[in-house]
Design a protein with these regions (language model features):
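Conserved small-residue-rich beta-alpha loop and adjacent elements
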Residues: 102-168
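Conserved NAD(P)+-binding/catalytic subdomain of aldehyde/semialdehyde dehydrogenases
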Residues: 174-245, 249-252, 256-261
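Short loop-to-beta-strand entry elements in the cores of soluble alpha/beta enzymes
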Residues: 204-206, 226-237, 253-276, 292-303, ...
Length: 423
């Protein structure tokens, strides 16, 4: 990893992400979207054969296929998926917002009610690996929110099937339908609907540059969660941290993707050097060594600051997807953090705990998005309409406020809706 002194760097340049240029594929993706919108299932099958190398007759996964997946899945993985689902469910139930009302003034009651959206689509990536955990993280919050129809889409394997773990995870999470389609064409199917794939109101879940571009283009016709990019971690630590623990977290992030970003920010030069030594040692024996080395060569940095205040400033400026805090007083350090997708406190809270089963969601904002967005949650699938109820006396009192403003703005019919009721 590159070791840098805070006093000698251009911070903005140092923390700049390696970017996927979504714009360069927009024309290609736009053509895919338009083709699917026009030709529906035929276009879906065309692109599945072209990009995935497989011909799919029935896009929808059958009940028999799900039952077969249960029969062949390793028992220990089944138990693990069920336990992870239970933890995720517990956490996301606490996120359900409350309905409430208050008396703003005598005779004027206003409040909030809670209603789920009707349908959601969950994109589950294929490619380098299968991610049953991503199904749990996207489907469970939607079902807890009360979404009636939750649809999963995921690329088929070369044999035309979906991996057993994906099907079982979708069933455990409560997915209503699963379709054998990936890429931009899957997003198009969810956004516009086809003969097989239902149109949904919101699309969530990470994907490659083509999926990201497709979500960007259909946004406004359907909702999406937030822009997604390469995975990232920032570790904020002092000399009390265990350098070997930190090294394992750096490698855990780096093995995701060659474009993953890994930062250690510390006021301890000794910790910086020891952590880097462990990173080098562990990389040599890592099964995904090539990916890790490429990732760290691109975006693996250790920044040594003079003070923890400087380290905290760097952290908030970077706004990491994942933030590990390993300091003498983690809660005190946490009180100064404003920008992070998900935060892991102390020596025994690796990012992987949140990835799989601590209960929090691992679909998180990247690329500095944590300055503006929160991670995926139950609330992402919920609307909160406001409600008001006025008595005649309340309306009369409110007219003293509303009528002058309405007339000043030139909305005389607005003002008249008060006056008529108060005759």
């Amino acid at each position: 990893m590159e070791i840098l002194n805070y006093s000698e760097i251009d911070l903005a340049e140092t923390i700049k992400r390696s970017e996927e240029d979504v714009n360069k594929v927009l024309d290609i993706v736009s053509d895919i979207l338009n083709n699917v919108k026009l030709n529906k299932d035929d276009a879906i099958r065309e692109y599945t054969e072209k990009f995935d190398g497989v011909t799919i007759e029935n896009l929808k996964v059958s009940k028999d296929e799900i039952e077969e997946a249960y029969d062949t899945l390793d028992d220990s993985l089944l138990v693990a998926l069920k336990q992870a689902a239970s933890n995720i469910e517990k956490f996301h139930k606490k996120q359900i917002p409350s309905e409430w009302e208050l008396e703003v003034n005598p005779g004027i009651v206003a409040g909030q009610i809670v209603r789920p959206i009707n349908s959601a689509g969950c994109y589950i990536p294929g490619g380098r690996a299968a991610y049953p955990s991503s199904i749990l993280m996207t489907v469970i919050p939607a079902k807890i929110a009360g979404v009636k129809k939750v649809v999963c889409v995921t690329p088929p394997q070369k044999d035309g099937k979906i991996l057993d773990a994906i099907l079982v995870a979708a069933d455990i999470a409560g997915a209503d339908e699963i379709y054998k389609v990936g890429g931009a064409q899957a997003i198009a199917g969810l956004a516009y609907g086809t003969e097989s794939i239902p149109r949904v109101e919101k699309i969530v879940g990470p994907g490659n540059i083509f999926v990201t571009a497709a979500k960007k283009l259909v946004y406004g016709q359907v909702d999406i969660e937030f822009p997604a990019g390469p995975s990232e971690v920032l570790i904020l630590a002092d000399d009390s941290a265990n350098p070997e623990f930190l090294a394992t977290d750096i490698l855990a992030q780096a093995e995701h993707d060659p474009n993953a970003s890994c930062f250690l920010v510390t006021d301890s030069k000794d910790l910086a050097i020891k952590t880097d030594e462990f990173v080098n040692q562990l990389t040599q024996i890592a099964p995904r060594r090539e990916i890790i080395e490429e990732s760290l060569s691109k975006s693996g940095k250790i920044i040594i600051t003079n003070t923890m205040d400087e380290a905290i400033y760097v952290t908030n400026e970077y706004a990491p997807e994942h933030l590990i805090i390993s300091t003498k007083d983690d809660d005190e350090t946490l009180s100064h953090i404003n920008n992070a997708g998900s935060i892991f406190l102390g020596s025994y809270s690796p990012v992987a705990a949140g990835d799989y089963g601590s209960g929090t969601n691992h679909v998180l904002p990247t690329g500095g998005g944590a300055k503006m967005y929160s991670g995926l949650s139950t609330e992402a699938f919920i609307k909160k309409p406001t409600v008001q109820r006025l008595t005649k006396e309340g309306l009369k009192e409110l007219s003293k406020t509303s009528v002058p403003i309405a007339e000043y703005e030139g909305f005389f019919a607005h003002a008249n809706s008060f006056k008529t009721r108060l005759k």
